[in-house]
Amino acid sequence: MTPHDPVSVEAVPKIELHVHLEGTVEPATVLDIAARNGLALPVSTVDELSALYRVTTFSDFLRLWILTTNVLRKAEDFSQVVVDYARRAKRHGAVYIEGIFSPVERVMRGVGWAEIFDGYCEGAERAYAEHGVVVRLTPEAYRGADPELVAEMVRYAGRYRDRGVVGVGIGGDERARPTRHYAAAFAPAVDLGLGVVPHAGEFPLFPDGASGAATLRETIEALNPVRIRHGIAAAADPALVAVIRERGIVLDVCPTSNLRTGAIRDLADHPLPRLAAAGIPCTVGTDDPAVFDTDLSREFTIAARLGVEPRLLYDAGITGALCDDDVKSHLRQIGAATTWPTTTATWSTTAAGESL
């Protein structure tokens, strides 16, 4: 095979740094886990729950998130989520995943910290043993949470560093509470060996017309992150683009998610190619693939159609990954052994994708 031969999108190795593990759970699995845990849902069939998965706004997404994540209560639930996603992602070429999970909400509903962390870590170990996919974990709090609970999350993350927890983050409504209110909670992260990987800059414009660049800038100044999940609001602010580039911050971008939540109106206008052209390392991820009906092949295809080559995404993934040097070396070897497509003309796919 030469770089000019057609290359299957599924065959190209992929690194995913932005996926919420709770958002990978498909409707049938939600119903199964709810039944296993003796929990009642407002719907009883896969079709009824699938209808709720068709979100068109961020508010729709948050309502669904609360409904579906509340069924996860036991270590076996959390472990199953990781293993199931690793199996599906492998079919799309995933070789390394940094999965996000949200322990604070579960703790507030009576689930123990250890139950959550043990379950997800066991799932990461099983994902590699059963499917050969390296999974690392980044627990995440939400803006609006009690800062002391967030600090406790960071402390627990440090205790599980040797089981694959590599970073910590914060997400949710960017204007619910200023990120600086959580600066003290995240301050110990570096000494614990953890990278800080918050969500910010998801919306270039908020519904009231305010710029998303302001909350992105505030998050960068408050937390000094190594990566930003989303970050597309930076594209409208050249000074902020310069800050991100100079600090070496990697952006974990999710095109389909941005379309589904209304962050952008048209994939053809997505800022990913502008950010990449500005010298910012960008990865693409699925965010919440079960909710947004997407997968890694689809996201890489969208990026390719926007002019961002898969090798560039893969190399940015290595740059941003919080794994140890041995794993990074392994990922570089995979990249070096791959025949990468050099133009979108050689990028063949059977994956579903939005027209651009």
Curated annotation (Swiss-Prot):
Entry's Gene Ontology BP terms: menaquinone biosynthetic process
Binding site for Zn(2+): H18, H20, H199, D287
Annotated family: Belongs to the metallo-dependent hydrolases superfamily. Adenosine and AMP deaminases family.
Cofactor(s) demanded: Zn(2+)
Class of enzymatic activity (EC top level): hydrolase
Active site: E202
Highest taxon of the lineage: Bacteria
UniProt EC number: 3.5.4.40
Alphabetical UniProt keywords: Hydrolase, Menaquinone biosynthesis, Metal-binding, Zinc
Binding site residues for substrate: R73, E140, G172
Entries under PANTHER family matching the protein: ADENINE DEAMINASE
Protein name: Aminodeoxyfutalosine deaminase
